[in-house]
């Protein structure tokens, strides 16, 4: 793997360490004091070593120091490598900041994420995991369906750089391929670089965004100042050659403009065959980056809720209806699903998706979900089950309102174990029991943990 010294390095000192365990980010943890070369003043001090695995004895270069701990990067393994070590699949691993765990076996990656989730639940909520769900695994190595690729022109070198940020830096590392990006996108990166490099106003390009549906691809070019017509023509020629949708964006989302010549609908699409559903979305809409995990996640959420025909379900932070529509299929025509989302544009997209799928038992509302919503009519319909899929910040501000619904079952989908654990503590205080929890490998080879948890209301027993 490629490695370079951190720009924050205060020392080039190299030490020997025996790696004891993993950190939450997948780094190896060691302590000063075992080897004679360790300064006595550092004995007992914790060290985090990137790319080192438990059980390995390594040489590591210290790259960052604080009073409580130090950070280092692996230089060499002195004895047998860990059985959990594998060869990274990407030549850019170790420099590119996108992946952090390609050197770890998939099974060990899952175990690390389970440990992170369990320790957060115990630390923040005092909850113990009694039943683990079978991990939801990605079915493709090239799982990512969208990517933001940085573009920077260096006038002094007359050189264009296109790639991803380096680890711990704002610098871009040039990328010719990406092992975790859908190969239909990854294989296009070299020719896309050539197209951008030919532009007259290439210095005006800030970054590009690639997004995919099941069949369609969109290219969004973010630029600082107006591009000349000749550049737009070149971009349109390329989009036509690839049969891609092409968008330009100068400022905010309201400046998004489609400029390709296809005249096709301004949407991408993905299907969920298990529920006979099709979804439409725009390049700026939030969608899950891993299509195969999303498919499994939707089925798992519905299975955990054990929905019956005629039940009423509330879906908070519903987005474009990714969960709402499968839930509506489960409860049937006699049931009801209410989806609530902060973005009016996403609510409109959810309505469109429901109509496209001929679902009439679902309704959507736009509501700031960081504030009290208990006085709204939609919040007083009574719900048998609840699904919540908040952003990384979680839903702490409204957890006691959620608990007051007294739904029999709550499924909480999270991309942040810390906020899930914090919010789970509130549910526990309101009489909900954590029944099952699991990790979903939405972001393979990274430290990011996607999880799903089932809570059930405990029947109160009168003395």
Swiss-Prot record:
Q: Which reaction does it catalyse?
A: uridine(1939) in 23S rRNA + S-adenosyl-L-methionine = 5-methyluridine(1939) in 23S rRNA + S-adenosyl-L-homocysteine + H(+)
Q: Which residues form the active site?
A: 415 (nucleophile)
Q: Tell me the domain of life.
A: Bacteria
| The EC number(s) this enzyme carries | 2.1.1.190
Q: Which Pfam families match?
A: TRAM (PF01938), tRNA_U5-meth_tr (PF05958)
- What are the record keywords, sorted? 4Fe-4S, Iron, Iron-sulfur, Metal-binding, Methyltransferase, rRNA processing, S-adenosyl-L-methionine, Transferase
NCBIfam families from the entry? PRK13168.1 (NF009639), rumA (TIGR00479)
This one is known as 23S rRNA (uracil(1939)-C(5))-methyltransferase RlmD
> Species name for this entry?
Acinetobacter baylyi (strain ATCC 33305 / BD413 / ADP1)
Q: What lineage does UniProt assign to this protein's organism? A: Bacteria, Pseudomonadati, Pseudomonadota, Gammaproteobacteria, Moraxellales
Gene encoding this polypeptide?
Answer: rlmD
